[in-house]
Amino acid sequence: MAKTIMIQGTMSNAGKSLLAAGLCRVLKQDGYRVAPFKSQNMALNSFITKDGGEMGRAQVVQAEAAGIEPDVRMNPILLKPTTDVGSQVIVNGRVQGNMPAMEYYRRKRDFIPAVMEAYESLAREYDIIVIEGAGSPAEINLQENDIVNMGLARMVDAPVLLVGDIDRGGVFAQLYGTVALQSEEDRRRIKGVVVNKFRGDRAILEPGLKTLEELCGVPVAGVVPYLHVDIDDEDSLSERFGRDKEPRLIDIAVIRLPRISNFTDFSPFERYENVSLRYVERARDLRAPDMIVIPGTKSTIADLQWLRQSGLEASIQKAASGGTLVFGVCGGYQMLGWHISDPKQVEAAGVTEIDGMGLLPLETVFQGEKVQTQTNGVFSGVAGLLSELNGKRYAGYEIHMGRSEEARGALFSMGNVYGSYVHGIFDEQEVADTILKALCTKKGVSFESLGTFDAKAYKERQYDLLADAVRAGLDMPLIYRILNQEV
């Protein structure tokens, strides 16, 4: 069976996901077969594996860092919020249905067999399992039925690294308080604490680190700097949305829907030096972009209502009539059509039908069975501004409940309005390049002035930079002693 180490945090967004990815990369570099694991993830950012299973993207990133194929066993339970008090529950990659939060909480321990089967299966195939917790083990109201933090650590007998975020302040209180709120048994599982997202001279921290070790009775296993790496990370969501880049040669506006999903679809465009990718949630902030993207969403009808009430729908329609390129992905694609109906209330109780934006000739009906599959092929029949996509390869995955009439192929278009069910459709560098070339031609600027790069080599380099920072920040001899159960 594999050795294991678990990374827990003092709070959400403490940097667990990225630290786990970095540790996966370090251990891979050191010659180990490594797999990530997170028993339960709550996220709208998901991925479809080769066998059609759905899992959280955080574990996909960690698998990529480890150099292995993503597998639903790495994230056996995925919760995708549908409302403020309920989620779609996905177990072993397959939808089990929608469930109110309290019902899931009551039934949570029923999912332990699925969690353990997934973990034990991975543990038979790999040398080391790097486990990520969720939220904080200090949520004492959730400890009784916990299956993702200390509850999971007990089930798989995992030693724990506790991570605190110094960038938001109060890291010593975070770490000490979290340790103090654990039972004696669980405190013994904490083998090291980590100060994460540090900026500055470590020498300034040293007195506090020594006091922290004395108070907690646990060694400081590292001080990891604030990482400036370009890796898709769930913890960077609020930071990503908060960006408002200064003007660049090409301006792309992504509509920030309330229930936006798979925001990483647009990451390829962020990597061009002279492309501005903005997230917009107010009509007055839309301005006059070169391209408007309506992203995927977990609640198409509710987010279309929001789009309408906010005034953004009218602004997008006006921009489209003026020739601006408009592109919808998945739920955003459905919104662009004539009509959406949900007769069985698959999304949520409430509205069963709604008129779409009327920019594409398609009608969508939500059905009980979810489409979740990887897909690839060659573009054909693409007209208008993006006609140069014809003959070029695409790859990605589909995750949606609705079926749309008149939607054929990977890309459906009418004039300057385009839509696709394929998440990751921009990931192939040739696809992103072709779209940007078309925008440059329309605007009369040089594509070469945007700055180009090798996307695959760039991604691998980012994982190596992450590993360099994690290796330098962590006490790796201590990490290996923890893995070998020597502390």
Question: Could you say what each language-model-derived stretch is?
Answer:
Residues 1-320, 325, 345, 368-369, ...:
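Flexible phosphate-sensing "switch/lid" loops adjacent to ATP/NTP-binding sites
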Residues 330:
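Catalytic nucleophile serine of serine hydrolases
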Residues 337-391:
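A conserved active-site-flanking secondary-structure segment within enzyme catalytic domains
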